[in-house]
């Protein structure tokens, strides 16, 4: 890889035409003879060849940072997304992450900051595919991911694990997720599915359609997404009239909502909405991480929601035990004690 100064010069040059030190790893893993190089196909359909085990990782995306933690790769991170202090899981699991250099967000990558860290592997959301081209021209390996369904989340876990020689850890993680998904499906096999409206982070009148990851969470929790007819792959704006026509049994606020349950309950436009009339308005917890995002821990979002929708079938004790098991196993802290 080119030296630091050369990287910065090259990045600046490419940008004009295209529009911290690493933590010590907790466990580098063992490299089997002949394991590398590995060839992967990322979520952009690109073939990526990893010649040797990456030792310096960059993630500008909370979702992939959380995955790297679950795969015991956070010790190899040299740069992460902006404002990490907003993610409680970093402080709970590995406070040293808060000291790493910032490299941008899921929408905008700071190319110079990223290149200055001389990473071996950069993991980006699919929307930053133009940045991937620039970084690869500088000699860095880049994986583009888009975990907007349960299947794509599984693919992302397997892809990153293979790239970083963590396949056995990924197997344990996916085994846990599969086991808990089966537990939910069995517990909720014969339930009547109440209708659910999931509102967005910045705007109450935005929601997740059928092709978004959050729709999978609602289904797994034994609910019916009232916005299932929407096929947009990002948050869709609706009107009060549409929401009242749907008349959901439950209103669920996204974990990072900028408004409160009380705001919704006191909204004069919603006085006749069934969820408001019956007090069935709840906000997804965010005291560890955003379970309504496609992170490995999103299974806990489905578990929490199932407890809200079907409290007679899933008790608080059951949910807390599973949450503690997950975080103790993959993040080394006890959820119920935070």
Regions found by a protein language model. Give the residues of each.
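Positively charged n-region of N-terminal signal peptides that target proteins for export
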Residues: 1-5
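Bacterial N-terminal signal peptides
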Residues: 8-16
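Bacterial lipoprotein signal-peptidase II cleavage site
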Residues: 17-29
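Extracytoplasmic substrate-binding proteins
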Residues: 32, 37, 47-49, 130-206, ...
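A short, structured surface patch at a secondary-structure boundary
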Residues: 59-117, 121-127, 226
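Proline-aspartate-enriched helix->loop->beta-strand connector
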Residues: 103-106, 110-124, 140, 239-256
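A ligand-binding cleft/hinge motif common to bilobed small-molecule-binding domains
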Residues: 128-137, 254-268
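Alpha-helical, coiled-coil/dimerization segments enriched in small aliphatic residues
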Residues: 207-235, 239
